[in-house]
């Protein structure tokens, strides 16, 4: 089992409940999409799984370990096995892309190697290979502030590929990309995860991409799991309920009297 959550709640300091009674299991190597309206708790769930936030109640197990039962040092070693892809990657503007990618293994390297690599990138070939998979091989020595939002997101994905993470948690990893590039990038991420046996959980606003690229889809609404289904079983009724009064918009009937059709915006 790659991850397991039993009865997980998350209540913020202001009393707002972000997650309620989350029960979830992902086997090693599974690839799962997480969808739901804005504010549903998708990012909160990913932060709990990354052991960035401690749940208010319930049990969390990641890669065979209970993170909050570990010492701080052991928890840091666990985090080094987890790859995070951010919607807006936290990359220093003046940092070179090669250093941003190599940072994926800083938690796995000895301290001396990590420090040296920050000054003089030690594995340029490895960084280039990861970037080349995302058509960014020519950006190896560019500064991060010279890249577009979509390019920065792909650098973040390249860093996780270089890291060889056992568990990949991706929060809106393609939100800054056009539809075609987003599809290509998700297909690549899925192929790489499958080839390496990595577990992949990605939150997405674009429902069409979730259904197209992931075998299993989880719908989250108001901090609770609304459904957990194979992609082929996610029907219109499930999506209508998930996005009720949130993102679904009905087209007016055509002059010929055709019924209204419900559309889910990509973002």
Curated annotation (Swiss-Prot):
Binding, ATP: 36-43
Gene3D superfamilies: P-loop containing nucleotide triphosphate hydrolases
EC top class, as a word: translocase
Pfam family membership, one: ABC_tran
Ranges in a coiled coil: none
Record-linked PROSITE patterns: ABC_TRANSPORTER_1, ABC_TRANSPORTER_2, PHNC
GO cellular component, as recorded: plasma membrane
Main localization (coarse): membrane
Keyword Membrane included in the entry's annotation: yes
Listed InterPro entries: AAA+_ATPase, ABC_transporter-like_ATP-bd, ABC_transporter-like_CS, MetN_ABC_transporter-like, P-loop_NTPase
Gene Ontology terms, MF aspect: ABC-type phosphonate transporter activity; ATP binding; ATP hydrolysis activity
Keywords: ATP-binding, Cell inner membrane, Cell membrane, Membrane, Nucleotide-binding, Phosphonate transport, Translocase, Transport
UniProt topology in membrane: Peripheral membrane protein
Keyword Nucleotide-binding set for record: yes
Segments forming domain ABC transporter: 3-247
UniProt-annotated location(s): Cell inner membrane
EC number, as in UniProt: 7.3.2.2
Catalytic activity: phosphonate(out) + ATP + H2O = phosphonate(in) + ADP + phosphate + H(+)
Self-association state and partner proteins as the record states: The complex is composed of two ATP-binding proteins (PhnC), two transmembrane proteins (PhnE) and a solute-binding protein (PhnD).
Free-text function comment from the UniProt entry: Part of the ABC transporter complex PhnCDE involved in phosphonates import. Responsible for energy coupling to the transport system.
Protein family: Belongs to the ABC transporter superfamily. Phosphonates importer (TC 3.A.1.9.1) family.
Name of the protein: Phosphonates import ATP-binding protein PhnC 1
């Amino acid at each position: 089992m790659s991850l397991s959550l039993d009865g997980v709640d998350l209540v913020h300091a202001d009393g707002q409940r972000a997650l309620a009674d989350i029960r979830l299991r992902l086997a090693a190597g599974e690839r799962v999409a997480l969808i739901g309206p804005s504010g549903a708790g998708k990012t909160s769930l990913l932060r709990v799984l990354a052991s960035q936030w401690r749940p208010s109640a319930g049990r969390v197990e990641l890669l065979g370990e209970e993170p909050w039962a570990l010492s701080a040092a052991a928890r840091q070693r666990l985090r080094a096995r987890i790859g995070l892809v951010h919607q807006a990657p936290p990359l220093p503007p003046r940092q070179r892309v090669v250093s941003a990618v190599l940072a994926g293994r800083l938690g796995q390297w000895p301290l001396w190697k990590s420090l040296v690599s920050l000054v003089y990138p030690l594995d340029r070939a490895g960084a280039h290979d990861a970037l080349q998979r995302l058509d960014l091989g020519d950006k190896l020595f560019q500064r991060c502030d010279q890249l577009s939002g979509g390019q920065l997101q792909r650098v973040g994905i390249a860093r996780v590929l270089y890291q060889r993470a056992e568990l990949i948690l991706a929060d809106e990893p393609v939100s800054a990309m056009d539809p075609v590039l987003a599809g290509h990038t998700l297909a690549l991420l899925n192929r790489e995860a499958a080839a390496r046996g990595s577990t992949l959980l990605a939150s997405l606003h674009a429902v069409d991409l979730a259904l197209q690229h992931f075998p299993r889809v989880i719908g989250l609404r108001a901090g609770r799991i609304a459904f957990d289904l194979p992609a082929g079983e996610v029907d219109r009724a499930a999506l209508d309920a998930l996005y009720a009064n949130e993102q679904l918009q009905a087209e007016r009937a055509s002059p010929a009297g055709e019924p209204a059709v419900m559309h889910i915006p990509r973002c």
